[in-house]
């Protein structure tokens, strides 16, 4: 059994949310001291209004190691984490720290956990998660899924258009 954890910068479709293999760990946004979780309760209109009225502009914070560790729990023996680019956020470092802490606390566990630095954002993270799912469904070993997914990430290019 496997689980794919994607930070909330990734775009999970309704189908992926219902799949059972995918879950999100939320980033947080701060607008003048008002904290907003980037989860299903996120109100984009309220957020944009607050940003427009803000003197300083918004800040974001990555999920804590504890939030990642909670997401590791469950029956899955293969856990894959896909994070926002390590050059854009601390999400990758937080997830790696969470793996180290989790492994210290669960020394006897057979659970295998790997963190992918997407080197991307948004749909790039989602595509990586979908690649992991495709590879897992073919019955590949954990190590082979990691290897092929890292090769996939190395071949990706992400482009953004700002309006």
Ranges and model annotations:
Residues 69-79:
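Glycine-rich phosphate/diphosphate-binding loops that line cofactor/substrate pockets in enzymes
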Residues 84-106, 127-129:
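Short Gly/Thr/Asp-enriched flexible loops that form oxyanion-binding sites at enzyme active sites
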Residues 3-67:
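N-terminal glycine-rich anion-binding loop in soluble enzyme alpha/beta folds
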Residues 78-86, 114-117, 131:
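Short glycine-rich or small-residue beta-strand-to-loop segments that form or flank ligand, phosphate
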Residues 99-122, 141-142, 146:
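Short, acidic/small-residue loops that bind anionic groups at enzyme active sites
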Residues 42, 46, 63-67, 90-93, ...:
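Conserved active-site and cofactor/substrate-binding residues in soluble primary-metabolism enzymes
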Residues 108-111, 125-134:
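Acidic/polar active-site rim loop that often engages polyanionic ligands
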Residues 133-163:
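Internal, active-site/partner-interface "lid" segment
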